[in-house]
């Protein structure tokens, strides 16, 4: 999850890629529009959005069972926006990878 945060701060999708499995997905709403699909959509959005140098994050929950886990991340001031993310992770070849990200954009 730290690679994800680092990529958000740098504004470079490439910096967050290693946090995710290559087949990861993303789902959430931006306004009335469903933002859904392959995780590449997040990387592309992050590249367009730019650096979030003032981003503040807090992991508020972690639950691990064997080779699966969930993480809740609160992000404040991602270029002026506040997000709540839920990640599902899987340990793949000994490394934790984010398999899915669902998010809520606070208004």
Model-derived features: where do they sit?
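Short beta-strand edge/turn micro-motifs at domain boundaries
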Residues: 82-107
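Short, well-ordered alpha-helical segments enriched in acidic and aromatic residues
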Residues: 10-23
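Solvent-exposed, amphipathic alpha-helical segments
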Residues: 3-7
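Short beta-strand segments enriched in hydrophobic/aromatic residues
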Residues: 20, 75-77, 102
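Beta-strand-connecting loop/turn residues
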Residues: 22, 67, 94-95
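Surface-exposed, charged secondary-structure patches
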Residues: 25-30, 36-82
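Hydrophobic residues in alpha-helical segments
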Residues: 8-11, 46
């Amino acid at each position: 999850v730290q690679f994800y945060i680092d990529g958000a701060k740098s504004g470079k999708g490439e910096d967050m890629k290693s946090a995710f499995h290559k087949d990861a997905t993303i789902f959430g709403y931006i306004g009335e529009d469903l933002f859904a699909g392959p995780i590449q959509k997040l990387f592309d959005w992050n590249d367009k959005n730019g650096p979030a140098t003032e981003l503040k994050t807090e992991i508020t929950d972690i639950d691990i069972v064997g080779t699966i886990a969930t993480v809740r991340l609160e992000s404040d001031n991602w270029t002026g926006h506040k997000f709540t993310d839920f990640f599902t992770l899987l340990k793949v070849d000994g490394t934790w990878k984010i398999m899915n990200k669902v998010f809520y954009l606070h208004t």
